């Protein structure tokens, strides 16, 4: 009996198969560049070996699900004999809104609620819904568990999650900060507790999940206390293609100047801003660093804007946690591999005793290895820990569907 875990991105679909009885991972993979002319499918075996193939453009996430199931039952790969071996599917869903606060087993009512809030995470939730419905068609009798990134942040207090807008907007329309990357933050908090040998309920952290989407989380006594993303994943840090914090008046101003609808401006803020918007080159940090080496000004400026924003948030969260912080933890694809971003984000903090070991930092470039990158004399630990959202999803699945099923 198998568990399939699906993580639906804006243009990707990650998947993994686990043995139900012992939580052992059997295989994982990713379909990349969905909606592009040429898509890529990668399979990662348990021994670390990979196979990669190019496919004629996979046009949407439904087709990606169908392709994934064909791969999983491919007789040459010997992953599954039949799809009926899969009894449970766990989905990462970015936004649960105000009505879906905890992980749930899918039913028609839950699916309808999810559709009603899809506009709150326009890059992710609609694709997750497509994937869920595609699985329903192919495996109608399997249980599907939805795990929300917003669930982790339910412990944030009103003074931190409310915007200074008419209170009726919150009471009548649930306009508030929700926060994201919660599955990642939940895992990192537990793992940091183990590494630091400190009980979770007394653990204070500042966690930075830095990838194409990026956010920061203040953790107080092992629970989410504040976070940079808002009602949607657009707020906060400058990201790969998202603007992060801006003056909201810009939306109407540019709508008038460019003769575009506010919806079109919002689309630009989500898909054409951030690192891509400033550099006008790429949202891939590898490309950006190459351009910086070539002396390209806008790419350098994009990194300066990104790391300055990170530095401001770290400083504000140190204050929000009453200057009682056990560790600063970097995670996400950029967070664990990009030593340059970490160094720039923490530059100057040595003046208050938060010391990055530059040599250790430069050595920490692996997607898979945990690293302590602070100096011996640093007042708090600085860690780089690869995230494991699948671990959080598995834990939630077993809480909802016991192993003696």
UniProtKB/Swiss-Prot annotation:
The UniProt site entry described as Transition state stabilizer is assigned to: 181, 242
Q: What would be the name of the gene that encodes this protein?
A: ackA
SUPFAM superfamilies the UniProt entry points to: Actin-like ATPase domain
Q: Which residues bind ATP?
A: 14, 209-213, 284-286
Q: In which pathway does it act?
A: Metabolic intermediate biosynthesis; acetyl-CoA biosynthesis; acetyl-CoA from acetate: step 1/2
Which source organism?
A: Borreliella burgdorferi (strain ATCC 35210 / DSM 4680 / CIP 102532 / B31)
Q: Which reaction does it catalyse?
A: acetate + ATP = acetyl phosphate + ADP
GO terms (BP aspect): acetate metabolic process; acetyl-CoA biosynthetic process
Q: Know the name of this protein?
A: Acetate kinase
Query: Which PROSITE patterns does the record cross-reference, listed alphabetically?
Result: ACETATE_KINASE_1, ACETATE_KINASE_2
């Amino acid at each position: 009996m198998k568990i399939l875990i699906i993580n639906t991105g804006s243009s990707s679909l990650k998947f993994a198969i686990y043995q139900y009885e012992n939580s052992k991972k059997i295989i994982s993979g990713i379909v990349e560049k969905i909606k592009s002319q040429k898509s890529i499918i990668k399979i990662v075996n348990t021994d670390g070996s990979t196979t990669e193939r190019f496919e004629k453009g996979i046009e949407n996430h439904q087709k990606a699900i169908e392709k994934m199931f064909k791969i999983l039952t491919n007789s040459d790969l010997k992953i599954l004999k039949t799809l009926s071996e899969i009894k449970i599917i766990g989905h990462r869903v970015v936004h649960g809104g105000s009505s879906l606060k905890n992980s749930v087993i899918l039913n028609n009512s839950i699916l309808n609620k999810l559709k009603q809030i899809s506009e709150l995470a326009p890059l992710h939730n609609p694709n997750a819904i497509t994937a869920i419905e595609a699985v329903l068609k192919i495996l109608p009798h399997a249980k599907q568990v939805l795990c929300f990134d917003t669930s982790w942040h339910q412990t944030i207090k009103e003074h931190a999650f409310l915007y200074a807008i008419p209170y009726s907007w919150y009471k009548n329309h649930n306009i508030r900060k929700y926060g994201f990357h919660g599955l990642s933050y939940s895992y990192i908090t537990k793992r940091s507790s183990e590494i630091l040998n400190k009980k979770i309920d007394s653990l204070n952290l500042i966690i930075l999940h830095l990838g194409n989407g990026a956010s920061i989380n203040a953790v107080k006594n092992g629970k989410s206390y504040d976070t940079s993303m808002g009602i949607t994943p657009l707020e906060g840090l400058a990201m790969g293609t998202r603007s992060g914090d801006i003056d909201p008046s810009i939306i109407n101003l540019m709508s008038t100047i460019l003769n575009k609808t506010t919806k079109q401006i919002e689309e630009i803020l989500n898909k054409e801003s951030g690192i891509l918007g400033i550099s006008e080159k790429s949202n891939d940090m590898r490309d950006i660093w190459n351009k910086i080496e070539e002396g390209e000004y806008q790419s350098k400026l994009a990194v300066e804007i990104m790391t300055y924003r990170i530095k401001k948030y770290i400083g504000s969260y140190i204050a929000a946690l009453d200057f009682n912080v056990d560790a600063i933890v970097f995670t996400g694809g950029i967070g664990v591999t990009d030593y340059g971003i970490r160094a720039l984000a923490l530059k100057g903090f040595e003046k208050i005793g938060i010391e990055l070991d530059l040599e250790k930092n430069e050595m920490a470039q692996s997607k898979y290895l945990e690293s302590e990158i602070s100096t011996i004399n640093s007042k708090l630990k600085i860690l780089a820990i690869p995230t494991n959202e699948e671990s959080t999803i598995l834990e939630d699945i077993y809480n909802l569907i016991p192993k003696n099923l």
